[in-house]
Amino acid sequence: MPLPDFHVSEPFTLGIELEMQVVNPPGYDLSQDSSMLIDAVKNKITAGEVKHDITESMLELATDVCRDINQAAGQFSAMQKVVLQAAADHHLEICGGGTHPFQKWQRQEVCDNERYQRTLENFGYLIQQATVFGQHVHVGCASGDDAIYLLHGLSRFVPHFIALSAASPYMQGTDTRFASSRPNIFSAFPDNGPMPWVSNWQQFEALFRCLSYTTMIDSIKDLHWDIRPSPHFGTVEVRVMDTPLTLSHAVNMAGLIQATAHWLLTERPFKHQEKDYLLYKFNRFQACRYGLEGVITDPHTGDRRPLTEDTLRLLEKIAPSAHKIGASSAIEALHRQVVSGLNEAQLMRDFVADGGSLIGLVKKHCEIWADD
């Protein structure tokens, strides 16, 4: 399928997607009932969309195009109410978190969807292992060239986005020692990590044409880069965050990305070059492994900086942009999180250290999601 022309979007508009866990009490393992829930709510959603993701234990909540985080929060709140009622009617529960702490990937059923079945044919068991749960944020762009500039700019802050959203310390019944283990699942995919270097939209079109020769890539949706352009929406999509435990944190993460995008495209603070990516995977690993306690390294100077310190610096830089687009509350909340030194991954570990079980942890996550 040829790459569509870049759809012109209103700059800095938002679209947010949350991949939620559908669980089956009292054992709180993943359920295989997302299709049933989607059928139950499809005529009750007035804004946004509730839809499938890869496997039947995943439920995606997606906003419409929103002008700001307040509009997105309103849409999510309304969807949450409908979904929670449908889940209760079917004796199911819903929660966030980047991984389910003890599910077995072999039990996961891939959705009966042509695209997902084709992906299963291409990638085999890797698709079942990809039963993990992330937050994706789309930001509108006026042109393809703006999208490429924005993608490179946001890529500098991938470690910050991962560390702030880290919520997947447990996997397959084990403490992984990672703050965010979810991104590791995709390491075997041939398109894992950053997009190959291009400097403008014309070069991106040539890149996509080359990738399509593999016969594994039919559309941009078949590419699993950390950040990717979405020409049919006219957006750049950031895909590195774990699904948070609360809607409020998800909205705050979206506000962070929207404000960072506004700062990048209005100030143009960087002259991007391919060398920017030289230490990308090392810095990304630091964020996944240690969260905000990680240390990132500048590929140009060799300077090493604690992620906590660098994240506070980013929040300070983008504060004026956040004010202009109505996202100041998000930046203030994230600032408090960084200063406190707490993240959701550590809160999960604290629960288990205090004697809680992994079943109890999922139960608590369901309560947190329902009460937010």
Swiss-Prot record:
It comes from the Bacteria. The keyword Nucleotide-binding applies. The keyword Heme does not apply. GO terms for molecular function: ATP binding; glutamate-cysteine ligase activity. It catalyses: L-cysteine + L-glutamate + ATP = gamma-L-glutamyl-L-cysteine + ADP + phosphate + H(+). Its EC number is 6.3.2.2. Disulfide bonds: none annotated. Keywords: ATP-binding, Ligase, Nucleotide-binding. SUPFAM superfamilies: Glutamine synthetase/guanido kinase. One of its GO terms (biological process) is modified amino acid biosynthetic process. ATP-dependent carboxylate-amine ligase which exhibits weak glutamate--cysteine ligase activity. Homodimer. PANTHER family: GLUTAMATE--CYSTEINE LIGASE 2-RELATED. HAMAP family: Glu_cys_ligase_2. Belongs to the glutamate--cysteine ligase type 2 family. YbdK subfamily. This is Putative glutamate--cysteine ligase 2.
